[in-house]
Design a protein with these regions (language model features):
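Donor-nucleotide binding loops and adjacent catalytic segments primarily
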Residues: 43, 48-52, 171, 178-220
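Active-site-proximal region of nucleotide-activated glycan assembly enzymes
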Residues: 114-182, 187
Length: 220
């Protein structure tokens, strides 16, 4: 019987939100299971995870250099420290499975779990898998992806885990789109009779979108 699970992921909301959605579902369906989240002090998880009510264990942030630089020489030592910290989190929590969502924290979590013979389960949110999940997928017990086109061997398409609050909004709109739109406009203080343009973007791309839309606001 599953008693403890460690969820690893962080850095951006793209990793943290699906992680929290899974954590919430585990807590709802298996209230006896202990849930620990593994992240970093620098990522969004440092705020989002505790505010959601889950304990957060941290590891040092170890970005993988994409180009040859002095950082390559520091990588082995930094990665070793992160793997040790991830291993301590697995041991102290008694985790029987590690579920990873990608990001800097997932690589040391996967490596520490492998050393201990703890099963690894992976979810990849993006169409193009990140380095951590490409590595972990080599020995993961199961791999889930959002998109059918994601190139990870043996992956099962599950879609993107959504928090129940978000799923409820989707269901509300499907049931009555007009009423859902009117309700949302009123909550945001907008005129329901006027067109509404929503512009959204993630991570670094959001800044470019914000600047472009701000510059074009008068014309729009």
């Amino acid at each position: 019987m599953l008693k403890s699970v460690l969820l690893a992921g962080g850095g951006t909301a793209g990793h943290v939100n699906p992680l929290l959605a899974v954590a919430d579902e585990v807590a709802r369906t298996s209230p006896g299971v202990s849930i620990t989240v593994l992240g970093t002090r620098e990522g969004l998880e440092a705020d989002l995870v505790p505010s959601r009510g889950y304990p957060l264990a941290v590891v040092p942030k170890v970005p993988l250099p994409r180009r040859p630089s002095a950082a390559w020489f520091r990588l082995p030592g930094r990665l070793r420290a992160a793997v040790e910290a991830a291993g301590d989190a697995i041991d102290s929590s008694g985790a029987q499975v590690v579920v990873g969502f990608g990001g800097y924290v997932s690589t040391p979590a996967y490596l520490a779990a492998r050393r201990r013979g703890v099963p690894v389960v992976i979810h990849e949110q993006n169409a193009r898998p990140g380095l951590a999940n490409r590595l972990g997928a080599r020995w993961a017990r199961a791999v889930a992806v959002t998109f059918p086109s994601t190139a990870l061997q043996g992956a099962v398409v599950t879609g993107l885990p959504l928090r129940r609050e978000i799923a409820a909004l989707v269901e509300e709109r499907a049931a009555d789109a007009a009423a859902s739109r009117r309700s949302a406009a009123e909550r945001l203080g907008l005129d329901p009779s006027m067109p509404v343009l929503v512009v959204t973007g993630g991570s670094l791309g959001a800044q470019c979108l914000n600047e472009t839309i701000s510059a074009l606001a008068a014309e729009i």
